């Protein structure tokens, strides 16, 4: 009976040692993961480039330089038939690619 108790205690302590070492390893790996609050500069740059691209495309359509584009109409404009074309939508007086 004593040997069975001793074996159970040793097994539990061995399991505890493995569990704590695995938990420490996960803590070390957790430092390498990106947290949700961290900003990613590459994604921010892409978003800025898209906004600039949308703005320039809208300006081209407004100026009539695009053969198939129509002028971007702001909300409340009297010319409701004029819209952005080619997948662009008018938002905040700018054509945005959707």
UniProtKB/Swiss-Prot annotation:
Residues 24-50 form a propeptide. It holds the Pfam family Toxin_20. GO terms for molecular function: toxin activity. It is found in: Secreted. Residues 1-23 form the signal peptide. The keyword Disulfide bond applies. Keywords: Disulfide bond, Neurotoxin, Secreted, Signal, Toxin. Disulfide bonds join 54-84, 58-90, 72-95. Expressed by the venom gland. GO terms for cellular component: extracellular region. Residues 63-84 are annotated as: Disordered. The keyword Calcium does not apply. Belongs to the neurotoxin 12 (Hwtx-2) family. 01 (Ap1a) subfamily. Is toxic to both insects and mammals. Induces reversible paralysis when injected into S.frugiperda larvae. Reduces both the amplitude and frequency of responses from muscle (GF-TTM and GF-DLM) pathways in the D.melanogaster giant fiber circuit, suggesting an action at the neuromuscular junction, which is mediated by glutamatergic receptors. In mice, intracranial injection of 30 ug causes increased urination, myoclonus, hypermotility with circular movements followed by respiratory and generalized seizures resulting in death within 25-35 minutes of injection. Negative results: has no effect on human Nav1.2/SCN2A, Nav1.4/SCN4A, Nav1.5/SCN5A or Nav1.6/SCN8A voltage-gated potassium channels (at 1 uM). Does not alter the response induced by acetylcholine in a rhabdomyosarcoma cell preparation (at 1 uM). This is U1-theraphotoxin-Ap1a. It comes from Acanthoscurria paulensis.
């Amino acid at each position: 009976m004593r040997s069975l108790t001793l074996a159970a205690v040793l097994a539990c302590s061995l399991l505890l040692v493995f569990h704590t070492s695995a938990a420490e390893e996960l803590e070390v790996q957790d430092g390498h993961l990106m947290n949700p609050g961290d900003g990613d500069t590459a994604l921010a740059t892409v978003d800025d480039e898209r906004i600039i691209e949308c703005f320039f495309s809208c300006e081209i359509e407004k100026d009539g330089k695009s053969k198939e584009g129509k002028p971007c109409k702001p909300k409340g404009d009297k010319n409701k038939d004029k819209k952005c074309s080619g997948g662009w939508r008018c938002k905040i007086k700018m054509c945005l690619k959707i």
